[in-house]
Amino acid sequence: MTAVASPHTPVPPTESFVHVAPAGERPGFDLAYERRGSGEPVVLLHGIGHHWQAWEPVLSILAASCEVIAVDLPGFGASPELPEGVSYELDSVIPLLGDALSALGLQRPHVVGNSLGGLLALELASQGYARSVTALSPAGFWTGAERRYAYAVLLGMRAGAKGIPDALLHRMARSAAGRAALTSTIYARPGRRSPEAVVAETRSMRGATGFAPTLKVGRSPDVIFDRDIPDVPVTIGWGSKDRLLLRRQGTRAKKTIPGARLVSLPGCGHVPMNDDPALVARLVLETVRAV
């Protein structure tokens, strides 16, 4: 039987980087990533302020039957921010991510994303870069009020991450109550997260150079997903306890993409990979096999 990492297993920082060469008017840039397993290629995209380790232990489960590539988006985790003057707008970022897929030797992989990563996954599919999509609480199906609420929460999380001293962070992460105080906005089961993971993701939020430019671009009312993806299998999963992007946004997503499969994730928060990794991995594999 293949060993699978538990939510309590510390995940080491990535040491792999790919240089994405310039393409036409698009600049070159570097991207950090983790690559495991063999089989159908599956790319994992995290949410704003997070890093590739958000996908543990789902990554390890998927790697038992797929080639899994989890990336740190530009300006998040270990990836440097985009070159000066390069916009974080979707029209700019999606072609750059397409270039990154090519640099990783991938042609139309299956793409899985959470939150911001879910929106990026859907955009990649709509532009022909993805073979299938599993989007977990994807951004882009909000009303103006819902978007403003989410951004206020994110700004609060960022301020908290930047303001907490490391000594206090480590002390809080050692207790279930402390981990809940630090992460219950995004996890329904924060006690499952290891102290090491909580410290690492708080530091990731604190140091994310891509956070401010991404949030600035996302304040635009134009940041919505408003078109069908008729030729690509799409699964949309939404946590029943998502406190950041409310469940009714999943209903809008289904109306926008009528052929998508909308699945409720019982007992899961905004980042369900921690709350029920087996369920998330099963959704991904079902979508991969639907092609």
Tell me what each language-model feature is.
Residues 106-115:
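Alpha/beta-hydrolase fold nucleophile elbow
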Residues 241-245:
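Acidic catalytic loop of the alpha/beta-hydrolase fold
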Residues 230, 236-238:
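Short beta-strand/loop motif that positions the catalytic acidic residue
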Residues 1-42, 63-66, 92-94, 98, ...:
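Alpha/beta-hydrolase fold catalytic core
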Residues 258-291:
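Catalytic active-site module of serine/aspartate enzymes centered on a nucleophile-bearing elbow/loop
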Residues 168-228:
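Conserved alpha/beta-hydrolase catalytic His-Asp/Glu region
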Residues 29-80:
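Conserved HGGG/HGGXW glycine-rich cap/lid loop of the alpha/beta-hydrolase fold
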Residues 130-165:
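Flexible "cap/lid" loop of the alpha/beta hydrolase fold
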